[in-house]
Amino acid sequence: MKIAIDILTPKQCMFFSKLSERLEGRGHKILRTTRKYREVNQLLELKGVDAKIVGEHGGGDLASKLKASAKRILELSLVIEGFKPDVAVSFSSPELARVAFGLRIPHVCVNDSPHAEAVAKLTVPLSTKLLTSKMIPKKAWTKYGIPPDNIVQYNALDPWVWLKNLKPDPQILRQLMLDDSKPIITFRTEESFASYLLGKSLAETPIIPLIKQVLKRRRDVQVVAVPRYEEQKKSLFEIFNDKITICESTVDGPSLLYHTSVFVGGGGTMTTESALLGVPTFSCYPSKPFEILKYLVKNKIVTLERNPNQLLKKIKSTLDDLEKAKKTQAEKVQMLVKDFEDPIEVIVAEVEKLG
């Protein structure tokens, strides 16, 4: 079989590199495509994944997103026409879903983010199959126009794909000039350019005031910030300069989290990764909690707190008895993942059925 896979975000790079590796191992020919987007391009290079760049990220406003997507559909259609895949796979790529639909190629959509309404509306109705976490009810998807019978669920969280056999890179601490004898608090900024969060700036989230308070009250702590975009990186440098470690290029996130004492996330993937790796994890997600976040909070492996003062108190309490907090977290995670299945196996089976 010939299979086209579109990789648009760092999470998709981690997920689809494992999927394409498995498919290639089974004798299938894979075409990987991506777009011009700093974090993804750097991570693909870091992981040694070869992908053809087609089009670019639309940026932070709706008009730019629309134009970039329309242009990318045209460019991608030529690439897909040339490759002639039997099946197309994406994590709700609006461009690949539209191209596959237009060329009558079965499209397998992998998605764990029904809260991202814009991309769901543009992809889910055009998909032959939707592969998603069992933690998300089917009714969260059927409202987008896909029949329940076309939804296949797996009992796992997506990051389990690359975390279950994780081998952390021991060079990450040296690379970021961190001391493993001192506590490390890692902050991940939110997805401020995502269509579902447009209108919220970095300054409006708890991240900035929280980092300021941590620096003021805990001089023994090393602070690491992982920005998503150049604009976020510039803002952090302007405010903190060299008082914190700001990841200037894409880093191996799971390896950093492995050495992290406490994690504070404004998004989804790194928050889930951190929790599953047994790190005491806090979320300051700036909007209504999405399905996976609700699941993590319900199972008490993530604490949701947007108030900077309350969050600071909880971080301090965690750091005061860090070993106990990590032991408790690890025990909860162990109970949670013992029945997880491998999502890649489920997806491979569905893709091969369509071929």
Report the location of each language-model feature.
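Conserved donor-nucleotide binding/catalytic region of nucleotide-linked donor-dependent transferases
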Residues: 317-333, 353
